[in-house]
Amino acid sequence: LAENDQVGALVFDEVDTGAPVEQMEFEEVDYWDELTKIMDWTNTHVTSTMFLCWGAQASLYHFYGLKKRMLPEKKFGLFWHKVNNRKIPLVRGFDDEFLAPHSRHTEVPIDDIRACKDVTILAESDEAGFYLGMAEEGRKIFVMGHPEYDRMTLDGEYHRDKDKGLPIEIPKNYYKNDDPNTKPVLLWRSHANNLYTNWLNYYVYQVTPYNLDGTPDFSGK
């Protein structure tokens, strides 16, 4: 792996994903200073960054001062979402309503995000709140759920916490008849594929400025 000083001169497409530290204050996380430097670095070295779950919370806090808050109980399972603006390419091909996984103890209140003029909310849930948004014409993408989860991820989290004796509810809309002994029903794959395809097509490949040698050129950004 390249060292930090070597990576700093390179350019990438980037996904900042979640971490099991969401119940800590951001500044209490051991690597918070390093993470903020990486987030700032993306402004000049990454065409578009997708921030997932805690990564979305961290970026909304770092860039816009939006604070997270604890939920009374874990938001866990599949939740229905609606699309807010179909003219935006990121949601092209989305169903009017779609399911996506969530697994978190905290949230950024959607009213706080709505009040932030820099962030456009593209999809939300009556039950799970903010799900998908963007800023800077798509240079920053925020996903509060986990579309990347495979069929068994929520199942693994449920049985892990149950085996530890932790308070955990059966993930919503996930098992047939809410029976955790059955194989989970995979209901979000097409949405996830659509989201990542749109992101890479419309916000990375089509807009990354390239030099003649094939390397991205950010000199004009």
Regions found by a protein language model. Name each.
Residues 1-2, 24:
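A basic- and aromatic-enriched beta-loop-alpha substructure that forms the phosphate/nucleotide-
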Residues 2-6, 76-221:
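Amide-donor transfer/coupling interface in amidating biosynthetic enzymes
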Residues 12-85:
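Cysteine-nucleophile active-site neighborhood
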